[in-house]
């Protein structure tokens, strides 16, 4: 097989597409051989499991995701998603939020603390949020979708700790200070991971496009 590979590469030494394909196959092989160890949470100490809450029914699901996230980050995985299940979309019963929050408060706090004690938080950006908030006014026993004002938080990876940025009116209806558009958030995240969002611009059908549209700005006030 090695000989066939050598013959195939002859005359293609400068073919970047071939190198990219070989690199992709090698990455897939490394993932298949290393994934079982990375996903084996039994290798963690009882104290670590207790810290995350994997031993409790309420927090078990999200705790396992957060603990796995830390193990993946340790091994160089660049992008990890942990989804909180539950009824956040509470049109019918806003009191469910208390139950859902109880499933994730301990695990996410443990994740931040664990990353910090292992020296990983400074080089890991943690982003917590959803696509919209909930209205301050009632919708039956719940709340409606509210995209006009809601909160997201970022930690680690170049973010200034202990900082609150922006404010709403007293009811939480609308933003009154330091409005951050979703494109600004995306521009800031890209900046923190080392990408200039303006250099991702491409031309299509006579106009410019990029991930942050054409008006996103980095929020420098929250950067460390």
Give residue ranges: language-model regions:
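Ligand-binding pockets and gating/stacking loops
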Residues: 1-224
């Amino acid at each position: 097989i090695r000989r066939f590979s050598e013959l195939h590469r002859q005359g293609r030494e400068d073919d970047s597409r071939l190198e990219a394909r070989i690199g992709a196959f090698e990455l897939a092989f490394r993932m298949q051989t290393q994934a079982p160890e990375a996903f084996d949470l039994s290798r963690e100490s009882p104290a670590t499991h207790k810290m995350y809450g994997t031993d409790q029914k309420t927090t078990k699901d999200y705790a396992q995701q957060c603990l796995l996230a830390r193990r993946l980050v340790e091994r160089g995985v660049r992008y990890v998603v942990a989804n909180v299940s539950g009824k956040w979309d509470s049109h019918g019963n806003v009191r469910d939020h208390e139950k859902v929050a109880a499933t994730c408060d301990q695990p996410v706090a443990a994740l931040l603390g664990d990353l910090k004690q292992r020296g990983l938080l400074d080089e890991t950006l943690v982003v917590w949020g959803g696509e919209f908030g909930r209205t301050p006014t009632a919708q039956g026993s719940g709340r409606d979708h509210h995209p006009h004002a809601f909160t997201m938080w970022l930690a680690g990876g170049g973010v200034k700790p202990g900082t609150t940025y922006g404010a709403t009116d007293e009811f939480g209806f609308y933003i009154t200070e330091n409005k951050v558009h979703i494109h600004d958030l995306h521009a800031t995240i890209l900046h923190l991971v080392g990408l200039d969002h303006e250099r991702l611009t491409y031309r299509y059908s006579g106009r410019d496009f990029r991930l942050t549209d054409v008006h996103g700005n980095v929020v420098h006030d929250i950067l460390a």
